[in-house]
A protein has these predicted regions:
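Basic, Lys/Arg-enriched alpha-helical interface segments
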Residues: 1-62, 70-78, 84-87
Length: 87
């Protein structure tokens, strides 16, 4: 599977790193997704609705979310941040 990141995701990630988030936690989740394996239940992976339809939401930490889309052979990282940052 190929990996891509939106420009907004890259900005979001810079903000998360400035806030002291551990990038290794995000990398571990992305590696599972790239391998095509389901995420452990603690990540609360679920589809989104409304304007986010077609995307998935999972928790890196309780208030650190990753929004992504898997389409064909591509994992696209679209947004990351807290609930208040994203919704």
């Amino acid at each position: 599977m190929n990996l891509s990141q939106t420009a907004q995701f890259k900005k979001d990630m810079k903000r998360q790193l400035r806030q002291g988030k551990d990038q290794k936690k995000l990398i571990a989740v992305v590696e599972i997704l790239l391998a095509g394996r389901p995420l452990p239940a603690k990540h609360k992976d679920h589809p989104l609705k409304g304007s986010w339809r077609g995307r998935q939401d999972c928790h890196i930490e309780p208030d650190w979310i990753l929004i992504y889309r898997i389409k064909e052979n591509e994992l696209r990282l679209e947004r990351t941040g807290s609930h208040s940052d994203l919704f």
